[in-house]
């Protein structure tokens, strides 16, 4: 516990909050170009082929970002929108690609949570 005199001389040191998504540089999303689209396997208890893309952002960073949902249309040189948000079982993946924005198509046949996957409402009139 510091004395009053020590606090007057030095003061309290501010705790600096470290960003969880530094490549976005204080922006909610960033545009980028896919440099590589591939699949990778998750950490130990899980097993799958997770779809990821290496993206060069307009901020100059090159990051690995996750492609959510079933099926995608991304290739090399696709323009994508990247948001923050890590994938717990993929080490080094701290970003998500926004579905339904720029070159990324929404998920086909999605009925629930459509806004998260960029899917338009299915026409209820057709039966």
Curated annotation (Swiss-Prot):
Gene3D superfamilies: Nucleic acid-binding proteins (2.40.50.140)
Signal peptide positions on this chain: none
GO CC terms, sorted: small ribosomal subunit
Annotated GO MF terms: rRNA binding; structural constituent of ribosome; tRNA binding
Functional note: With S4 and S5 plays an important role in translational accuracy.
HAMAP family: Ribosomal_uS12_B
Recorded family membership: Belongs to the universal ribosomal protein uS12 family.
Name of the molecule in the record: Small ribosomal subunit protein uS12
Organism expressing this protein natively: Nautilia profundicola (strain ATCC BAA-1463 / DSM 18972 / AmH)
Protein's gene: rpsL
